[in-house]
């Protein structure tokens, strides 16, 4: 208790985060005792029922028109809505890979492990359900809110192997609430050798919109019932402040720090040809790869099959495709199978419409020791107008048990990608201690 209370009003620290983690798991375990139990694969069907989404693509326009009438049930201020507790949103879902072998095909990869991209899809669906549980009004048959994923704050892996023949348990609840945004934390564990062991911890931030997904909508405030809950809520405030600070210091807005400029200049000097004494003649240092040669690209046609309950492309699908491309990029870069360490700072900047062409571009941005930092940029191309729009930027940290070549930028733009990758890598290492 002293560990948490002494630090509630201080700047975020690795010590605080590690100290708080057992509280989050303890609180979550207490809530799950009375939480609704469900299997993971019907979650998306449950979400369709909550919002009244169509099950057939041909009926989606009618379903959207019917949802528009729900605007009359939106609150005009947050004060109109009853406060909810963390217990109200607690959800437990199971993926019975051990007890139902027929499910394994969807989740199995070539290496006889679980496809992590599928886990990302399940996390995204569950986060939305958790938030709808928080805002649920039993007087209404359908929710007037459109709750969508705004960002993935962090996913930290707790183990390297996810077994394809052992049951997986997802638990989670709301941990922080603003006026129109809401944070949900989830914990994934797997039953192996007679006990559940930690797999990952994830933090998602969702936003509430009106039934037509055109403007923000108010959500129920959060009622805190214990010092442990106050500590968890305070961590949500810290997360929000950290995101604002990182956005303010973005290399897209401000110049690199003096230390970062020195690092880039030293990288540049290491690539100069000492025989010519010229700024134009560049040579690749030993055990290095030009950033230009550490890329991989992909294309997806956005079909209705991958739509979410609001008839845009499902965010979990985007995360899965980005992860798989980033993994392939890291694998090809080093010639060995990489292990995921963390996912962080995924921002959903713009929804992806059905029929769009989704362009994915992966880049190895930074390497250090046995770690690789990969950035995946996604954009949509409207084939009729030929306009490009960025939808997401994903950041993945991988680990490989072998020597990894350094990645070397040549242009100023590549240098900024290098520094941004280092920032994300350093943040991941700090959060994991």
PLM features per residue range, with description:
Residues 31-56, 60-115, 222-315, 430-432:
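Catalytic strand-loop segment that frames the active site of acyl-thioester-processing enzymes
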Residues 112, 116-119, 131-149, 161-163, ...:
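Single-stranded nucleic-acid-binding OB-fold domains
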Residues 114-142, 314-338:
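Active-site helix/loop of acyl-thioester processing domains in fatty-acid/polyketide metabolism
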